[in-house]
Amino acid sequence: MPLSYQHFRKLLLLDEEAGPLEEELPRLADEGLNRRVAEDLNLGNLNVSIPWTHKVGNFTGLYSSTVPCFNPKWQTPSFPDIHLQEDIVDRCKQFVGPLTVNENRRLKLIMPARFYPNVTKYLPLDKGIKPYYPEYVVNHYFQTRHYLHTLWKAGILYKRESTRSASFCGSPYSWEQDLQHGRLVFQTSKRHGDKSFCPQSSGILPRSSVGPCIQSQLRKSRLGPQPEQGQLAGRQQGGSGSIRARVHPSPWGTVGVEPSGSGPTHNCASSSSSCLHQSAVRKAAYSLIPTSKGHSSSGHAVELHHFPPNSSRSRSQGPVLSCWWLQFRNSEPCSEYCLCHIVNLIEDWGPCTEHGEHRIRTPRTPARVTGGVFLVDKNPHNTTESRLVVDFSQFSRGNTRVSWPKFAVPNLQSLTNLLSSNLSWLSLDVSAAFYHLPLHPAAMPHLLVGSSGLSRYVARLSSNSRIINNQHRTMQNLHNSCSRNLYVSLMLLYKTYGWKLHLYSHPIILGFRKIPMGVGLSPFLLAQFTSAICSVVRRAFPHCLAFSYMDDMVLGAKSVQHLESLYAAVTNFLLSLGIHLNPHKTKRWGYSLNFMGYVIGSWGTLPQEHIVQKIKMWFRKLPVNRPIDWKVCQRIVGLLGFAAPFTQCGYPALMPLYACIQAKQAFTFSPTYKAFLTKQYLNLYPVARQRPGLCQVFADATPTGWGLAIGHQRMRGTFVSPLPIHTAELLAACFARSRSGAKLIGTDNSVVLSRKYTSFPWLLGCAANWILRGTSFVYVPSALNPADDPSRGRLGLYRPLLRLLYRPTTGRTSLYADSPSVPSHLPDRVHFASPLHVAWRPP
């Protein structure tokens, strides 16, 4: 007969009317009983022939590919002008006096952050934007490009200009040296065989023209021929007559990439161009355009009249080095959905490429990417804005993976000890926290994102495309890209992006200037940064509490008025460091702080309400007597494990689930086990703050007996049969708690001290978790343990009770370091003649 829930409760000693603990509890350690109960509850039957269930409620397997939902109306979030002050250490010193060793070390880690992977794998540009949304290929392409452009404009990305240089927007740091102190000079690198052309200064162009062709069109490097540079590109000009092109003069040399793959070297003079690209190099290269007057890079429109057409090459002949987008302007429409209808909508499509305000030298950067990007909803509650997901998982895989630095995170008890108080709370939101921390330019070649341009992207994804290879594109296959879908998508996108459609249709390669989210180093750096800042704030305001976990920062003060003045002071300090806060997301919590998924008050800690509701909903949908895929069980354990410390039996209750996941077998919930778990999670108990105190109760055990010292009283008992020593010590601790009611017990066993009961026999672990809930343990060496003699059957000998003080720990977290005392910026001692003097001690 299967075990009923009531019998099971009684067995676990969860009911009040259980028998004497000294008899009942050792029985739960019996292997035979544990095995019989597991069979009755159908917990041990891992091999099942019925098909597995792969979905329970919203839970599917951890690694199942749930397709994210695309929103054509996503808005790209705006990024403030984030610039963390370079002299952050000096500013902190002005604020709080000398910094501690820990604070100094952490702040130096991120000024600038460095990233040196063992091996970097370079991927073709086609893999730059992941085809996550096959239904919305073009829309996703442009939204992602717009997002990347926004990040570049906000100074978060570098743009690769050539193999050895990059440009960026925003304020430069001292380690980002402009080329030749502001003179933008292309270095000739003999080692890699780069032939380069040098404009003389940042705003003024050279007067002499360079000749009919620029050799740097084909940069030969170790990677073989680099992709074509886009600046000399032109579109075929049929008839003569005046053309109007908006020329954007610029000091830049060769740009990142044009559609990759390069054919033979093209003679620039022989391919005529009316798509006059906006580059000073191009202007210098074409002797047809007068260059006697230098132009600043402000982008004035220039009228160019009577540009002679070159009739030496017919429209369909040979490769044309050109801008794919503007080539459509002069071509005949191939259908009503031809892209030339869109290209002819406006006269001025703006520049083919934009350049940043500053230019720096970088290590050699190939025209490739190292990770793909795609867009998703910003978060489950905000589906109107998009978030960029960057996949740099190559650094976490394989034999060459980077082992990321570990950092301590407070566990639940440490967090409760620290934050469970009668303070009034407020939480701050750091906007785009990761993008505050600057990366050294040497890391740029390892963290590249980008795209191969619209033509390649569409060609690669359209199955019927005949563009086999970009380097052999001719005017006939220019129209291979034209399709109804592309036309409709571009028409709709034209309303949103206007002339930027042209800019975004070009290839681009971008490297990270601030730390990206997709690299394992970033959470570590962010945790170090915010913990150092909080440490400084705590020392500046010793009567308050500041604490952070990643980008979540909380402030606590005794009263609401006090908290408001603290908020004003801390906000001003953070803004002076260049940290951007989101004032709309500042939340005032009163006396119950919501933090890291918990509600923390003076009474202790509980899970937040939305998690409790999620658990209840999941139990309603949980099927019984049906094998559930172990990957779904991983999700279940993730949810239940978060709330386990608040239940009677804690983690040990979930051990059967852990076992099935380890065995990679399906798990079947019996009605009794489901009822047991449901009841466990319906009544949650807060985890209380541990209090300091003097230990008066001690427990000890041998495999055959146990002994207690409760004040001056000594007790002992024996086990029916010898038990493993850890099990015996756990039983002794349980007896000490039930006999004395003390919340502080001294023991010499490290396993009991750890309060992890998952390695004990299942039934004993569940029962012990409930008996010892809220108990704190103090380590006492065996030689000094007053319960040592009683456990060995010697009651006559009295060892004196130790004065064992217990201090609750806030954990070894890098996020909360009790700062060693340092001289503050105010004098420590008050002069003895002062009216404030209480008791003067000689210096």
UniProtKB/Swiss-Prot annotation:
Stated family: Belongs to the hepadnaviridae P protein family.
Keywords: DNA replication, DNA-binding, DNA-directed DNA polymerase, Endonuclease, Host-virus interaction, Hydrolase, Inhibition of host innate immune response by virus, Inhibition of host RLR pathway by virus, Magnesium, Metal-binding, Multifunctional enzyme, Nuclease, Nucleotidyltransferase, RNA-directed DNA polymerase, Transferase, Viral immunoevasion
Activity regulation note: Activated by host HSP70 and HSP40 in vitro to be able to bind the epsilon loop of the pgRNA. Because deletion of the RNase H region renders the protein partly chaperone-independent, the chaperones may be needed indirectly to relieve occlusion of the RNA-binding site by this domain. Inhibited by several reverse-transcriptase inhibitors: Lamivudine, Adefovir and Entecavir.
Reactions performed catalytically: DNA(n) + a 2'-deoxyribonucleoside 5'-triphosphate = DNA(n+1) + diphosphate; Endonucleolytic cleavage to 5'-phosphomonoester
Region described as Terminal protein domain (TP): spans on this chain: 1-177
UniProt key word RNA-binding: no
Organism superkingdom: Viruses
Other facts: Hepadnaviral virions contain probably just one P protein molecule per particle.
E.C. number: 2.7.7.7, 2.7.7.49, 3.1.26.4
Reported function: Multifunctional enzyme that converts the viral RNA genome into dsDNA in viral cytoplasmic capsids. This enzyme displays a DNA polymerase activity that can copy either DNA or RNA templates, and a ribonuclease H (RNase H) activity that cleaves the RNA strand of RNA-DNA heteroduplexes in a partially processive 3'- to 5'-endonucleasic mode. Neo-synthesized pregenomic RNA (pgRNA) are encapsidated together with the P protein, and reverse-transcribed inside the nucleocapsid.
Organism encoding this protein: Hepatitis B virus genotype B/C subtype adw (isolate Okinawa/pODW282/1998)
Protein known as: Protein P
Pfam families: DNA_pol_viral_C, DNA_pol_viral_N, RVT_1
Listed InterPro entries: DNA/RNA_pol_sf, DNApol_viral_C, DNApol_viral_N, HBV_DPOL, Rev_trsase/Diguanyl_cyclase, RT_dom, Viral_Replic_Matur_Polypro
